[in-house]
């Protein structure tokens, strides 16, 4: 039988752990990920083993069994690449070049197929770029988000990967879980983390770890402030303080995100 990752939402995490909503529990959720089986394991070592077994079962057993995978190591390495570049903009050609720089001959088509297999197995999700001004999807660069944060935290923790990236990934998963179609947005020369659509509703969201400095606020609010339409605009962060609205751009603390969706 195929294995499917059942990723817990933050709300489910709180229920399972019997914790109140807030910064501390949200941080713990980001660090643990959403695999419920992880919550009862006694040691970090056993957690690592569990996450590795989930990854191997899906990648090496399910995908390899169903798909024409000639190079199993490449499949594994592409997944590692996605884990370490989740929430970064890149193209398939970028990854081809990355492997070429490591003296590995990889064809564009093989790479594209393997990425597709990883997506079909729900290990990672591809997010297309959406041009907000032109209201259309832009080909080329896209972003990938992981189905579960535990891959990053337990399997490849050595890479410099800030809480901000984990937060962005968690916000993506929450939007998706609640039935939104999610794009990464671009408006003129600015990037918007998420354009989320559901029925007639369109929401623009920026996810950032902390808004503590004026510079950060400026950087995170600027793209949203330049969009001239009347759709909802939010900055999601992990600040203890709830900031006031800024010209229609509202601030929401990550642990309260579900309330507005």
What are these regions (language model features)?
Residues 3-5:
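Short, small-residue-biased leader/transition segments that mark boundaries at the very start
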Residues 43-202:
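Accessory nucleic acid-recognition modules appended to NTPase machines
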Residues 187, 228-247:
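Nucleic-acid nuclease catalytic cores
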Residues 200-212, 220:
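Active-site ExK catalytic segment of metal-dependent nucleases
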Residues 17-57, 68:
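Amphipathic alpha-helical "lid/sensor" segments that cap RecA-like P-loop NTPase cores
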Residues 239-261:
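Domain-level recognition of nuclease-like catalytic cores that cleave nucleotide substrates
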Residues 216-232:
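Short, charged, amphipathic alpha-helix that recurs within catalytic cores of restriction-modification
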Residues 145, 205, 234-236, 250-252:
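Hydrophobic/aromatic beta-strand patches that form the interior of the parallel beta-sheet core
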């Amino acid at each position: 039988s195929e294995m499917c990752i059942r990723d817990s939402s933050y709300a489910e995490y709180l229920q399972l752990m019997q914790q109140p909503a807030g910064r501390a529990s949200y941080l713990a959720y980001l660090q643990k990920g959403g695999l419920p089986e992880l919550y009862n394991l006694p040691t970090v070592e056993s957690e690592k083993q569990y996450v590795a077994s989930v990854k191997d079962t899906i990648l090496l057993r399910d995908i390899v069994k169903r798909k024409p995978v000639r190079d199993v190591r490449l499949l594994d390495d592409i997944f590692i690449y996605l884990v370490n570049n989740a929430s970064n903009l890149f193209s398939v050609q970028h990854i081809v070049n990355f492997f070429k720089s490591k003296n590995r001959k990889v064809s564009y088509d093989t790479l594209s197929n393997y990425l597709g297999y990883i997506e079909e197995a729900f290990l990672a999700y591809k997010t297309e770029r959406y041009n907000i001004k032109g209201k259309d999807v832009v080909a080329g660069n896209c972003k990938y988000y992981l189905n579960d944060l535990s891959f990053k935290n337990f399997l490849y923790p050595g890479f410099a990967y800030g809480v901000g990236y984990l937060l962005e990934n968690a916000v993506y998963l929450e939007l998706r879980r609640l039935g939104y179609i999610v794009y990464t947005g671009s408006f003129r020369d600015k990037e918007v983390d998420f354009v989320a659509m559901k029925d007639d509703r369109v929401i623009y969201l920026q996810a950032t770890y902390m808004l503590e400095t004026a510079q950060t606020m400026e950087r995170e609010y600027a793209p949203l402030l330049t969009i001239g339409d009347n759709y909802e605009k939010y900055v999601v962060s992990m600040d203890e303080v709830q900031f006031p609205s800024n010209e229609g751009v509202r601030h929401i603390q990550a642990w309260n995100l579900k309330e507005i969706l």
